[in-house]
Amino acid sequence: MRQRMSRMPSSFYIHTFGCQMNQADSEIVTALLRAEGFVPSADETNADIVLLNSCAVRENAEERLGNILMHLKGRKRRCKELVIGVLGCVPQFERERVFSDYPFVDFIVGPDNYRELAGLVAGLREAVARPALLDYDQTETYAGIEPVRAGSISAFLPVMRGCNNHCAFCVVPVTRGRERSVGFERVVAEVVALEKAGFREVTLLGQNVNSWRDAEKGLDFAGLLEGVSLAVPSMRIRFTTSHPKDISEALVKVIAARPNLCNHIHLPVQSGSSRMLDLMKRGHTREEYLDRIAMIRSYIPEVAITTDLIAGFCTETEKDHRETLSLMEAVGYDTAFMFHYSVRPGTWAARNLPDDVPDTVKKARLQEIIELQNAISREIFQREIGKTVEVLAEAESKRSESMLMGRTPENRVVVFSRGRFNPSDTLLVKITGATSATLSGEAV
């Protein structure tokens, strides 16, 4: 039972955790709430409603969610009218735990139920029980809702939701449901609208974006990319995230042929061991993954490839770990998201495999992966010194107002003296320095 509110809350603030899809969802939630008269707050302390758009992919994201919730518990003790809601993936598959561990949370809402959020908040004054909106909607894509975007240069655009792959370690099919795609014409119309609004770059999003389909038009993701590229030839186009088994030669040919499709592919491998990949239910072997890398580079020699890596998955041996390290060297990733394995409730691995790699071993293997990737990244970035590259300026550098930060088509971050340039400008920069994470240079 919850305490009834004496007044209607009017302002809100959103904490966003996790992936780009969650960032896009927070922009959709902002639009839906604003349409019903709620006002975004610039900071949490002045908001009547604090929403936490949660991520369940890894344990550390849930830990950060818990830390902020405990901070809000103290604030709610001082201000009982504060409304706290948890959105997204965590409540979708751990409803009872959210309510039991955090009894001060007023409501929870899953990723398919954001259209009902404003009505839920409006009804809180009369609610006795804590509302939970967690129904799956296999048709919901939020198409037609114009997000309130956080930036004005680069935009995220979800083109599909959900995932049908059921990898052993992954909660996404549980939290996001089955795959469904936004239609071709709707995607193109939204990208054209972004261009007219002044955006210079768009990233097409999906948990498994290469599975996008428009059955009525007989189009796959290669057809979508080509259509979007032709519709907005002056915009940079990116996409994420891809599954290795779905990277087709036709798709790579489109990227190679269209100048505004960025030469960057994020292709999560998770492990370099075929035994591990089989246990993870990834649907490909080490050799098949390397064949796809070779195919990509045969069409796009200058492509930047990035990845995700998991250290210490169930039953992983030292031999399996060494195969991951050797694959990293063979591919030469620009960068990687690197984590040690944490059990996710509701996954196939949680039900069927022992989490038998000691934490000390997981952390040691992860550190080896990080150190190797840093060395590979440093070598790749140092090879850029002396080259002149195209950069889309995105913002002032955190180091100095006299510097700008931008990215190359390969998604490499470049910091340079701003001179006469401003954010949203596209310019040429001669690279003069490099670390394992950043390039630096001078505008040409």
From Swiss-Prot:
Q: Which terms are listed as keywords in the entry?
A: 4Fe-4S, Cytoplasm, Iron, Iron-sulfur, Metal-binding, S-adenosyl-L-methionine, Transferase, tRNA processing
Q: Where does the protein end up?
A: Cytoplasm
Extract one GO cellular component term from the record: cytosol
Record: residues binding [4Fe-4S] cluster 1? 19, 55, 89
- The answer to whether the entry has keyword Cell cycle is no
Kindly provide the name given to this protein in its UniProt entry: tRNA-2-methylthio-N(6)-dimethylallyladenosine synthase
Name the residues that bind [4Fe-4S] cluster 2: 163, 167, 170
> Where's the MTTase N-terminal domain?
10-126
Q: Any idea where the Radical SAM core domain is?
A: 149-379
Similarity remark:
Belongs to the methylthiotransferase family. MiaB subfamily.
Domain TRAM, first and last residues per copy: 382-444
Q: Quote the record's cofactor note.
A: Binds 2 [4Fe-4S] clusters. One cluster is coordinated with 3 cysteines and an exchangeable S-adenosyl-L-methionine.
Renumbered to this chain, the signal peptide range is none
What InterPro entries does UniProt report for this protein, alphabetically? Elp3/MiaA/NifB-like_rSAM, Methylthiotransferase, Methylthiotransferase_CS, Methylthiotransferase_N, Methylthiotransferase_N_sf, MiaB_methiolase, rSAM, rSAM_horseshoe
SMART domains, alphabetically?
A: Elp3
Cofactors: [4Fe-4S] cluster
Question: What top-level class of enzyme does the UniProt entry assign?
Answer: transferase
Looking at the keywords, is NADP present? no
Which EC number(s) are documented for this chain?
A: 2.8.4.3
| Biological role stated in the UniProt entry | Catalyzes the methylthiolation of N6-(dimethylallyl)adenosine (i(6)A), leading to the formation of 2-methylthio-N6-(dimethylallyl)adenosine (ms(2)i(6)A) at position 37 in tRNAs that read codons beginning with uridine.
- Quaternary structure (record): Monomer.
Q: Which domain of life is it from?
A: Bacteria
Q: Name one GO molecular function term.
A: 4 iron, 4 sulfur cluster binding
The reaction(s) catalysed by this protein are: N(6)-dimethylallyladenosine(37) in tRNA + (sulfur carrier)-SH + AH2 + 2 S-adenosyl-L-methionine = 2-methylsulfanyl-N(6)-dimethylallyladenosine(37) in tRNA + (sulfur carrier)-H + 5'-deoxyadenosine + L-methionine + A + S-adenosyl-L-homocysteine + 2 H(+)
